[in-house]
């Protein structure tokens, strides 16, 4: 019996697993049926099915799923499944929205039946998911069914996978799902209800299907069609001709593919360069492109019609889009080639093979469809009543609201509508009256089209079917039941829609309220008469002749702006001059475009009445609510200024803003409107179409329109302010404008001369045809049709607010092509476009579009306007039938089906076949993954995520090589035996598991998300930013620029290349970075901090990802050894091969530094990342590197260039660090380089010789030389031994170097010089930054610490820059260049008393100076984003080293001499597992000297009380979460931390390992030798730097002294904090600190541990400083503060918006600094800065508090760490672990208890608890992930905003076209040109006025949008510049050429300019927003106004 029972149970488990893992629709249904049969369950019993299934399937894998579903189902809104118990619902379509609706209805207790027409889920297309949708799906157990669901940064999923997930959930809940059933209509209840009480049924095919017998009370259409259910009228949005092409390529999930970054599209919106290159290279002309990596490689692009014609994709050009895109008119082969070519180019040919996936017809999965017209249903639901039966009919998904692709709006709004519909059904079932149900549903539906990820509620955990939980300002009673009566169809209402329009849209043109409208010309005339009263020579009696002299116009302007016109000086006789003056001033100052020229006005007998009405209306609208000058005589100057500002138009502001090429002009009204618009634009962000909607879509109620009008008027005032700002900015822009701008004259001045070749204002300048008043635009004195206003080069339709004009040849260009005007390119390029122009001239609609790829439709529309009706109707009518049938993609699909069946007679291929073909690579792995996911949520998800990381994230991990493989390669390169590899591999898995478990589901989710995200999202970002490797991601700029970058890299062998790369990326980066400066940094750091993160990720992935620390250690050890060797060789080679190294370094640096850190720092960061990844990357490199000269260089080059994609992280990391370091000191550095690279490297750095060389480049040549002698010995031993301890750290140190390396590699001296130069540049940058900050009202970041010292340092000495590393310890001076060496010194110090004193010595001014320079550097690197990543790796390294050190240190009294390292235990051993051993060893080795240097890194963390540790963690956590903060963090923290950590970590770790090594290798002396260099290094620091550092330290002391010092002195418990402080505080601390800092970031305690000793020794700032290194502590502190200040400043520079955050970050950073008066302060500050930076934006206050707390506690901790705490190390470690987990738990679902439990379990499983290093690494990793995720979110937000703006601009264009069309018709009638004779019909005149007003509103709205777009563009540019600058500044100034330095200055200046522009824009928008807020008391009305009618995207 028992056995049989067991078999049954096992079988059930197998069947359940099969069901969960099913990959097709049919397979899922079959598996589910088998499961039910086996368990003897009947799904038809829907009420109890789920509960029975749950009770019968007692399977641990299922329990996690039950838990999630129970949690969801227990929500109060579902009333325990009894809310809709007797309601029967039919859902049409098993798409994502239909299934999602079914799930909610089922949870409500309803009987739900879903019918699906097909039986296969075949759509590979990828959907972008908004954050709430991810949260929602996770809550339904998505990860249980699809382990890779949104892992890491991935936030998209294929439609197929989403359907499978929801299908499985639906089946489990007992929902009936029928496939192969097609809905054909409703069957009304029979009239004879007495005999048969039959209700509503469905008519289906096949007719005999049981579903046809069901009766329903609710039917929901979710099949994506437009006409499945009757009664829903559609609103159409017609944009420009938009042709989309989607393509799916097979994803084989190879490493190479994993490295290719995704493209999210944001960069392309503003980055025209890529599209230009694409067109030049391939002839493909796109408007946009997006690439998502999912089960397939999914590309979606918007192609321009002309390029499709040119490439032969479309055979014939038809006006009708249906004909145009019909299968007969499309060459399929050409289409495939077109898609493949575009995909290949956009990914830089990095996808190895682009084989098409197949669709369900077995054909290549490529589709082309038209989404010019998108539809939205006018209502979401209706009720039908027939024969006593009511039927509630509703729509969800695309049927309700078609999405504008590809922003993820479809699924997001679809899910929202699904929940809204469920809420409606709930109300219906609970007995609410039908009209009330409908009124509530429509009130909610009003908001749906306006939802964006930003304006929905942010508390996703509270989401339920109740709309109040999802829409922030919802008024569910907005509509009254009486207003929706038309939606209740009792079968009697004849004209539902007429009634509906009257009810819902009482006014079709809400904007024109009676009092606002100038409907009667008498009103306008009366206003003009009042304004011109009392002016001599002005007598206004009409709207024509009275204005001829021009005096009346001048009088109106003078009345309001007497400052603009000297009325008394005007001569009444000079008609032309007077009019031209008025026109010019109105255009320039008020944003009102002229309707004619002064010359024309003088030459005509009587001015045209219609033109004058049009023109004067704009003055009326602008000034009607303003005070005239006579009324303002009593106002003070300030009030007058405000008044003046209020009469300035945003448009004019916009036209000046950054219009260095040419002035942008806005339509006459546009500027005015802009004024309104600007204010609205703020709102626009949410629904950017506010105004226009009002004007065109008469959807809003009257109230809304009036409110809107009021708002508009108010906005006008704001506009003026904008204009005022614009004028001020304009002067500056013009000063800075490029020479070319001379050709571009101000519009005003140009207009003054009436072009002789013009026929007048009624003749189009371009096509020479008649241009009517309503369609007339003017720019530069020319008048033309909107559709004729095109770029001479590319024929893109131009906007008045964005164009460039070449005065000499009278041609207009889009800004990107202005530079081509003289190149002959224009002529060459124009041909392709030429037809367009010609066609435009013809005025054919199709031509317009053709010419306009961007605004095809609009052009067409414009032309159509000319011949009203025809074109438009022509376009619309042919496609109407089809359009009503289905959505664009559906139409495409149906076309395909038809053509396929006719031509090839193909049947649909089975879903299995399709899946097998498309997903072969996925399916092989899939089962395991799925199984894993089902296993245990936390474990599974973590595992999967980790797996994903391995597979997909390899990029982040090892640059695309799975870590295991990387390890193997690494080992092989190192000469590791296969067995060892196997051993390490075995080790790693354990660790991975542990980590996974430890992280838990949520954490894991985060990690997964972050890592994968970092892979995917990061890739996307990278793509946008750079094609670089994940490591390079940081630096990555747009992928568009990647190529450039690579080329530049090639050209610039040294850091220059990296810099150059950055610039290339700059544009894209700007976009990305700008919009997400923090993101980019954060992402880079997290994701792409290749140096930091990459290093760390490698490290972490290696170590962290490596589940167990031991494993990681082991791996690290072997890797480190190999790496060390490689690195050494590489270093040597690097010097020899500067160009190669620079490239690679650049890449690595770029990646690393790209975020915030300077290259050096990044290098440091990189190293750590490299150590694992590097080792792997290095393996190839290593081999080559082995031959120091040739191999390394050539390989790096190859690797670097190609591997960018292939070996981005690792190789880049490896090469970068290696090269960098070797450059400075070939010999010394070589060793160091390897050391740095490898964990051992870090350890090795302890050997003074090696580190010094490495550091030397950073610090100064002298150091290298001194160290040089030691390098070789240190090299190998250190390399090998330190590897383990240093794995993380070494990477970090190396990265530091590597960043500085490009030039370093080339030559030590050069490097030094460059470093100096760099520091000068940095200083200049900081100063400017401070200025900007001040101008912004922000407190300038305190740069004195980092920046100033840095400057002096560099100035005084190259070493200065490196001084931070030098700071670490006297010995480390040589090591200085290598941050890690510093650490060794510190360790060394413990080894030898001499060392220790040097540590203290740093106190000395020179020390401080060193520190300052170090700080500066650190700042840079931190800012690069090293901080986060570095922190991770450093933390890890520190954790292993420091923790190990802590343990040993703790074990051994500080005073006792360090015991010799166990002979068998090498640094490598120490590495991860070795951490513990290492710690002991370190302790023994370093103890006496260590007390200050060692103890504090390792032990402090251990000893500090948990609380303290936690605090630190909390701090870290706080800092972790936010991308914005991340940016700051990268800026602040990363810089500080990174450098510091680099230096910091290595010192402690190295000390021990070094000592061990030294002892083992007889290297102790070298360490001591190092010490002297360190001392020397300290002196190297300039006095200025020292002073600055000291000042900083003092300031910090003051702020934190009491707390931090007291704490530090009072308790060693604060050790943790001390650790944090230490990491910031000393360079050794820096190297350590980097690790520690990272750790501290992650595990403040970790940091504290390392720092404690130092702190203890130097309770006072100075004392602490010396202990850390020469100037290490001080330097650390200083540098950390300085860097954080710097980074803050930088961020402020970069992103004005960040200013506040930065301020906070600054403040926060400072408090931390304060906590550790000396090093501790710095250390604390540093970690804090990093963390805070990360979190500052989001949790500024919290951060501050936590920072201060942790700071204060940390210092005390540090002080106490000395003796007792060392022992505490293990405890501390555990606590750190916990804390880290806890801190992460904030981010994750894990609770602290869970974390504790987990950690305890882990420790049980693995006796060895996570070392502090590991913990910190993990923490760092999480932080990085959080930052990455945040950055990604920022990027996505920017993308979303850009796409919304783009779409709205298209909408505005279309509306304008329609208005112009009507206006032309009315004008013709009024002029008698319509064949009816001249009519003075008052009705026509009234109509004319209305149209004029609407057009003005449109223009104003368009200008608003343009301002938003401009602001977004500036944000983006700033972000890219910021990124590039970071990359460049990461390289030591002494490594840079004059050209590079001047380039940096240029970038800085440009950035300042961008910041100023953005600040003015932001200020303007903010002011308008505030004004609007005051005027808008009714929020609901505001929502309405926001474009419910306009924006259906």
Curated annotation (Swiss-Prot):
EC number: 1.14.13.225
Amino-acid positions noted as binding Zn(2+) 1 in the UniProt annotation, renumbered to this chain: 764, 767, 785, 788
Protein's recorded name: [F-actin]-monooxygenase MICAL3
UniProt GO molecular function: actin binding; F-actin monooxygenase activity; FAD binding; metal ion binding; oxidoreductase activity, acting on paired donors, with incorporation or reduction of molecular oxygen, NAD(P)H as one donor, and incorporation of one atom of oxygen
Coiled-coil spans in chain: 1817-1983
Cellular component GO terms held in the UniProt record: cell cortex; cell projection; midbody; nucleus; spindle
Free-text comment on this protein's domains from its UniProt entry: The bivalent Mical/EHBP Rab binding (bMERB) domain, mediates binding to predominantly Rab8, Rab10, Rab10, Rab13 and Rab15 (in their GTP-bound forms).
Protein source organism: Mus musculus
Top EC class for this record: oxidoreductase
Positions where Phosphothreonine occurs in the chain: 887, 1274, 1339, 1452
Binding-site residues, Zn(2+) 2: 791, 794, 814, 817
Stretches assigned to the bMERB domain: 1832-1981
Binding site for FAD: 97, 116-118, 123-125, 183, 298, 398
Biased composition annotated in UniProt, kind: Acidic residues: 938-951, 989-1014, 1065-1090, 1516-1530
Pfam family, one: LIM
Keyword Acyltransferase: no
Biased composition annotated in UniProt, kind: Basic and acidic residues: 669-679, 975-988, 1039-1051, 1111-1148, 1199-1212, 1405-1420, 1584-1600, 1795-1811
Biased composition regions of type Polar residues, renumbered to the chain: 860-873, 1230-1239, 1257-1275, 1434-1452, 1623-1633, 1754-1763
Region annotation (Disordered) ranges: 658-704, 854-886, 905-1023, 1039-1309, 1332-1546, 1559-1837
Function recorded in the entry: Monooxygenase that promotes depolymerization of F-actin by mediating oxidation of specific methionine residues on actin to form methionine-sulfoxide, resulting in actin filament disassembly and preventing repolymerization. In the absence of actin, it also functions as a NADPH oxidase producing H(2)O(2). Seems to act as Rab effector protein and play a role in vesicle trafficking. Involved in exocytic vesicles tethering and fusion: the monooxygenase activity is required for this process and implicates RAB8A associated with exocytotic vesicles. Required for cytokinesis.
Stretches with biased composition (Low complexity): 1421-1433, 1665-1685
Ranges for region Monooxygenase domain: 2-494
UniProt lineage: Eukaryota, Metazoa, Chordata, Craniata, Vertebrata
Location of this chain's protein in the cell: Cytoplasm; Cytoplasm, Cell cortex; Cytoplasm, Cytoskeleton; Nucleus
Entry similarity comment: Belongs to the Mical family.
PANTHER family named among the record's database cross-references: [F-ACTIN]-MONOOXYGENASE MICAL3, CALPONIN HOMOLOGY DOMAIN-CONTAINING PROTEIN DDB_G0272472-RELATED
């Amino acid at each position: 019996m028992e056995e049989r029972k067991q078999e049954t149970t096992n079988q059930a488990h197998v069947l359940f697993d099969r069901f969960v893992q099913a990959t097709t629709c049919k397979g899922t249904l079959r598996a589910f049926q088998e499961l039910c049969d086996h368990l003897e369950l009947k799904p038809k019993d829907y009420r109890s099915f789920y509960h029975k299934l749950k009770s019968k399937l007692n399977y641990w894998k299922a329990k996690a799923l039950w838990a999630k579903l129970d949690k969801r189902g227990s929500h109060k809104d579902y009333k325990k499944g009894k809310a809709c118990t007797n309601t029967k619902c039919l859902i049409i379509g098993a798409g994502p929205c239909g299934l999602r609706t079914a799930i909610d209805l089922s949870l409500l207790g309803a009987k739900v039946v879903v019918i699906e027409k097909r039986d296969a889920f075949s759509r590979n297309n990828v959907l972008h998911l908004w954050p709430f949708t991810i949260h929602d799906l996770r809550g339904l157990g998505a990860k249980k069914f699809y382990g890779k669901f949104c892992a890491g940064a991935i936030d998209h999923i294929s439609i197929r996978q989403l359907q499978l997930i929801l299908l499985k959930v639906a089946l489990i809940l007992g929902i009936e799902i029928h496939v192969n059933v097609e809905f054909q209509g409703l069957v009304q209840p029979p009239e004879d209800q007495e005999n048969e009480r039959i209700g509503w049924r469905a008519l289906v095919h096949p007719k005999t299907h049981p579903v046809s017998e069901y009766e329903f009370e609710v039917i929901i259409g979710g099949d994506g069609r437009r006409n499945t259910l009757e009664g829903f009228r559609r609103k159409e949005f017609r944009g420009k001709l938009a042709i989309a092409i989607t393509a799916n390529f097979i994803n084989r999930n190879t490493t190479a593919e994993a490295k290719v970054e995704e493209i999210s599209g944001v960069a392309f919106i503003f980055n025209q360069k890529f599209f230009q290159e694409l067109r030049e290279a391939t002839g493909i002309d796109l408007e946009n492109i997006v690439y998502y990596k999912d089960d397939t490689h999914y590309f979606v692009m918007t192609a321009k019609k002309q390029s499709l014609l040119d490439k032969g994709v479309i055979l014939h050009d038809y006006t009708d889009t249906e004909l145009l895109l019909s299968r007969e008119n499309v060459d399929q082969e050409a289409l495939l080639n077109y898609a493949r070519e575009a995909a290949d180019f956009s990914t830089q040919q990095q996808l190895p093979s682009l084989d098409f996936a197949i669709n369900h017809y077995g054909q290549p999965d490529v589709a082309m469809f038209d989404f010019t017209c998108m539809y939205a249903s006018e209502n979401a639901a209706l009720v039908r009543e027939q024969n006593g039966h009511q039927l509630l009919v509703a729509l969800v998904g695309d049927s309700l609201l078609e999405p504008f692709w590809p922003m993820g709006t479809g699924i997001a709004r679809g899910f929202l509508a699904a929940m809204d519909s469920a809420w409606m059904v709930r109300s219906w079932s609970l007995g609410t009256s039908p009209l009330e149900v409908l009124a509530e549903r429509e009130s909610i539906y009003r908001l749906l089209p306006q939802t964006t990820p930003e304006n929905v509620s942010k508390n996703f955990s509270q989401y339920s079917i109740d709309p109040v939980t999802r829409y922030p300002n919802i008024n569910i009673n907005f509509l009254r039941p009486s207003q929706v009566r038309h939606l209740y169809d009792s079968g009697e209402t004849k004209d539902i829609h007429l009634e509906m329009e009257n009810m819902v849209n009482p006014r079709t043109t809400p904007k024109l309220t009676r009092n606002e409208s100038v409907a009667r010309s008498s009103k306008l005339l009366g206003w003009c008469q009042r304004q011109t009263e009392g002016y001599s020579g002005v007598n206004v009696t009409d709207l024509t002749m009275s204005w001829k002299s021009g005096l009346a116009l001048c009088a109106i302007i003078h009345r309001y702006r007497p400052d603009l016109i000297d009325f008394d000086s005007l001569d009444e006789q000079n008609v032309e001059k007077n009019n031209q003056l008025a026109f010019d001033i109105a255009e320039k100052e008020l944003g009102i475009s002229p309707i004619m020229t002064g010359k024309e006005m003088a030459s005509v007998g009587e001015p045209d009445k219609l033109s004058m009405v049009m023109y004067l209306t704009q003055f009326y609208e602008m000034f009607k609510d303003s005070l005239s000058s006579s009324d303002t005589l009593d106002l003070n100057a300030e009030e007058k200024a405000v008044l003046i500002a209020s009469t300035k138009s945003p448009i004019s502001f916009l036209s000046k803003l950054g219009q260095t090429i040419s002035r942008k002009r806005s339509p006459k009204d546009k500027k005015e409107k802009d004024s309104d618009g600007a204010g609205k634009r703020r709102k626009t962000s949410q629904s950017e179409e506010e105004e226009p909607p009002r004007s065109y879509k008469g959807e809003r109620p009257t109230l809304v329109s009036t409110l809107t009008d009021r708002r508009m008027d108010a906005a006008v005032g704001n506009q003026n302010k904008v204009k005022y700002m614009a004028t001020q900015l304009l002067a500056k822009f013009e000063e800075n404008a490029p020479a070319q701008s001379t050709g571009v004259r101000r519009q005003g001045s140009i207009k003054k001369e009436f072009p002789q070749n013009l026929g007048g204002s009624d003749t189009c300048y371009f096509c020479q045809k008649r241009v009517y008043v309503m369609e007339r635009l003017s720019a530069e004195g020319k008048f033309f049709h909107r559709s004729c206003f095109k770029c001479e080069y590319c024929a893109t339709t131009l906007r008045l607010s964005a164009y460039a004009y070449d005065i000499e040849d009278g041609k207009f260009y889009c800004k990107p092509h202005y530079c081509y005007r003289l190149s002959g390119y224009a002529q060459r390029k124009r041909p392709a476009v030429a037809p367009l122009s010609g066609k435009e001239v013809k005025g054919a609609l199709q031509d317009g579009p053709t010419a306009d790829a961007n605004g095809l439709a609009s052009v067409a529309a414009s032309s159509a306007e000319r011949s009203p009706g025809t074109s438009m109707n022509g376009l619309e009518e042919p496609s109407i039938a089809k359009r009503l049938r289905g959505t664009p993609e559906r139409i495409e699909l149906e076309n395909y089906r038809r053509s396929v069946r006719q031509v090839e007679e193909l049947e649909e291929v089975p879903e299995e076949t399709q899946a097998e073909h498309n997903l072969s690579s996925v399916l092989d792995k899939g089962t395991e993954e799925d199984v894993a996911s089902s296993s245990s949520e936390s474990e599974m998800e973590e595992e999967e995520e980790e797996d994903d990381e391995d597979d997909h994230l390899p990029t982040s991990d090892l640059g695309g090589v799975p870590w295991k493989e990387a390890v193997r390669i690494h080992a092989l390169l190192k000469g590791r035996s296969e067995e060892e590899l196997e051993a390490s591999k075995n080790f790693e898995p354990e660790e991975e598991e542990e980590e996974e478990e430890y992280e838990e589901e949520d954490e894991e989710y985060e990690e997964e998300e972050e890592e994968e995200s970092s892979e995917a999202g990061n890739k996307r970002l990278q793509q946008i930013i750079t094609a670089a490797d994940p490591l390079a991601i940081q630096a990555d700029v747009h992928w568009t620029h990647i190529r450039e970058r690579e080329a530049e890299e090639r050209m610039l062998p040294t850091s220059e290349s990296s810099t150059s790369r950055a610039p290339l990326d700059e544009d894209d980066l700007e976009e990305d970075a700008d919009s997400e400066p923090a993101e980019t940094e954060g992402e880079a750091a997290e994701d792409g901090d290749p140096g930091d993160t990459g290093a760390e990720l490698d490290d972490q992935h290696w170590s962290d990802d490596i589940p167990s620390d031991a494993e990681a250690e082991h791996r690290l050890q072997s890797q480190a050894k190999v790496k060390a060797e490689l690195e050494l060789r590489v270093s040597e080679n690097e010097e020899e091969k500067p160009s190669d190294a620079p490239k690679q370094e650049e890449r690595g640096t770029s990646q690393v530094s790209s975020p915030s850190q300077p290259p050096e720092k990044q290098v440091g960061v990189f190293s750590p990342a490299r150590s694992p990844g590097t080792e792997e990357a290095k393996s190839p490199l290593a081999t080559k590197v082995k031959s120091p000269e040739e191999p390394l260089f050539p390989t790096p080059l190859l690797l670097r260039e190609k591997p960018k994609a292939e070996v981005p992280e690792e190789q880049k990391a490896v090469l970068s660090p290696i090269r960098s370091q070797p450059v400075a000191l070939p010999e010394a550095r070589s060793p160091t380089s390897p050391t740095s690279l490898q964990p051992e490297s870090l350890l090795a750095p302890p050997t003074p010789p090696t580190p010094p060389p490495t550091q030397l480049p950073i610090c100064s040549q002298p150091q290298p030389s001194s160290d040089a002698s030691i390098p070789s010995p240190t090299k190998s031993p250190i390399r090998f031994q330190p590897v383990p301890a240093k794995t993380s750290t070494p990477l970090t140190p190396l990265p530091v170097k590597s960043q500085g390396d490009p030039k370093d590699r080339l030559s030590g001296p050069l490097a030094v010089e460059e470093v100096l130069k760099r520091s000068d540049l940095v200083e200049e940058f900081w100063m400017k930054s401070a200025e900007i900050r001040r101008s912004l009202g922000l407190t300038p970041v305190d740069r004195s610490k980092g920046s100033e010292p840095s400057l002096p340092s560099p100035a005084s000495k190259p070493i200065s820059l490196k001084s931070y590393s030098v700071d670490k310890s006297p010995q480390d001076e040589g090591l200085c260049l290598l941050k890690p060496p510093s650490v060794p010194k510190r360790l060394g110090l413990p080894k030898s008393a001499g060392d220790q004193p040097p540590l203290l010595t740093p106190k000395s001014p020179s020390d401080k100076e060193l520190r300052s320079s170090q700080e500066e550097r650190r700042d840079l690197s931190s800012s690069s984003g090293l901080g986060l990543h570095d922190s991770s790796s450093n933390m890890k390294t520190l954790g292993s080293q420091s923790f190990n050190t802590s343990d040993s240190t703790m074990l051994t009294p500080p005073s006792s001499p360090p015991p010799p390292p166990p002979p068998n235990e090498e640094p490598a051993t120490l590495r991860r597992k070795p951490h513990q051993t290492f710690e002991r060893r370190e302790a023994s080795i370093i103890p006496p000297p260590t007390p200050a240097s060692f103890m504090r890194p390792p032990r402090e963390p251990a000893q500090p009380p948990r609380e303290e540790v936690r605090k630190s963690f909390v701090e870290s956590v706080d800092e972790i979460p936010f991308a914005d903060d991340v940016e700051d963090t990268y800026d602040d923290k990363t810089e500080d931390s990174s450098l510091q950590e680099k230096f910091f970590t290595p010192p402690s770790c190295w000390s021990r390992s070094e000592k061990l090594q030294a002892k083992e290798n007889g290297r102790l002396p070298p360490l001591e030798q190092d010490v002297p260099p360190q001392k020397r290094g300290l002196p190297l620091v300039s006095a200025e730097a020292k002073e600055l550092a000291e000042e900083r330290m003092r300031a910090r002391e003051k702020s934190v002294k009491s707390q931090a010092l007291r704490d530090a002195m009072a308790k060693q418990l604060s050790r943790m904090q001390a650790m944090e402080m230490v990491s910031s505080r000393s360079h050794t601390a820096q190297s350590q600190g980097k690790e520690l800092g990272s750790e501290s970031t992650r595990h403040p305690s970790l940091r504290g541990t390392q720092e404690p000793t130092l702190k203890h020794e130097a309770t006072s700032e100075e004392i602490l400083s010396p202990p850390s290194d020469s100037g290490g502590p001080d330097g650390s502190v200083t540098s950390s503060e300085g860097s954080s200040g710097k980074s803050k400043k930088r961020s402020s520079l970069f992103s004005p918006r960040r200013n506040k955050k930065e301020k906070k970050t600054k403040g926060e950073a400072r408090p931390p600094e304060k906590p550790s008066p000396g090093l501790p302060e710095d250390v604390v500050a540093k970690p804090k800065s990093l963390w805070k930076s990360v979190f500052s934006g989001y949790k500024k206050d919290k951060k501050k508090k936590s920072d201060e707390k942790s700071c204060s506690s940390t210092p005390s901790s540090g002080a106490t760490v000395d003796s007792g705490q060392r022992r505490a190390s293990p405890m501390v470690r555990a606590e750190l672990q916990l804390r880290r987990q806890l801190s992460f738990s904030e981010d994750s679902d894990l609770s602290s208890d869970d974390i504790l439990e987990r950690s305890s379990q882990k420790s049980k499983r693995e006796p060895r608890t996570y070392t502090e290093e590991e913990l910190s690494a993990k923490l760092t990793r999480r932080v990085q992930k959080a930052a990455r995720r945040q950055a990604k979110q920022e990027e996505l937000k920017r993308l979303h905003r850009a796409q919304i703006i783009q779409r709205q601009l298209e909408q505005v264009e279309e509306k304008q076209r329609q208005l112009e069309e009507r206006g032309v018709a009315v004008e013709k009638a009024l002029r008698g040109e319509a064949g009816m004779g001249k009519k003075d019909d008052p009705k026509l005149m009234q109509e004319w006025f209305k149209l004029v007003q609407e057009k003005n509103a449109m223009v104003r709205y368009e200008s608003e949008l343009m301002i938003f777009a401009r602001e977004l563009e500036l944000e983006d540019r700033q972000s890219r510049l910021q990124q590039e600058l970071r990359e460049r500044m990461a390289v030591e100034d002494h490594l840079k050429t004059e050209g590079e330095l001047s380039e940096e200055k240029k970038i800085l200046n440009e950035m300042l300019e961008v910041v100023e522009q953005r600040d003015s824009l932001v200020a303007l928008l903010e002011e308008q927003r505030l004004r609007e807020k005051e005027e808008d008391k009714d929020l609901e009305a505001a929502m309405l106004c926001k474009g419910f009618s306009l924006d259906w995207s």
